[in-house]
Amino acid sequence: MTGKIKVHIDPKGYDEKPSGKEIGGIKSRLQKDTSPSLVTLEELVQKVETGHSISPGIMEGMSAKDWKEQQLFMVDIDNEEDGPILRIKDAKAICHDNGLSPAFYYQTFSHTKEHPKFRLAFVMDKPITDEGMRKYIMETLVNLFPQSDKSCVNADRIFHGTNKSAKLLNENGRISWEDIEAVSFPTQKNTVAAMLATQKCARIPN
């Protein structure tokens, strides 16, 4: 069954990477002035490849504390770390090895053949409404890819669209909380439950 997901989409598209005051305008339109859209993945990919920025987190304001829920999770692959360049085929192989099905990907405004920059999109099978779970999902996904931008984990993160290639891999592609739990790293010592408990405690005001 093909389902729709909720996401903030900037009504204005760009032919090149936004900068300066444009970025502030995008954030205001996305998270303050624009209600979330309910779209199919095909519709979302069409918006992304015509330069529309998106906010995967459903917000009731412009800061991370205003986050309410999220079903779409994005990973930035910027290839800025030392080590081998990670290309789309390599990222897809990592997903396959870990039982994760990315829904779509797209090359960013800054992408070149020599220096690939792209984003992978994952869709949960249901919206996430717990901030601790959101953070754990995001950190698990970014840590899975050696050339990902580890700073792109905040709840109010905005992702710009592109003027380059975007590809829908699986309209019905979804991942579950159990899929995320099954991803393991050699240096990961905390259990999921322990991490969530710690994150929830950290949110309790003094």
Where are these regions (language model features)?
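Signature for HUH/AEP ssDNA processing cores
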Residues: 1-116, 123-136, 199-203
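Helix N-terminus capping/helix-initiation residues
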Residues: 40, 87, 149, 175-177
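Long, charged low-complexity interaction segments
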Residues: 104, 182-206
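Short, well-ordered alpha-helical segments in soluble proteins
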Residues: 128, 141-145, 165
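Mixed-charge intrinsically disordered linker/loop segments at interdomain junctions
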Residues: 168-186
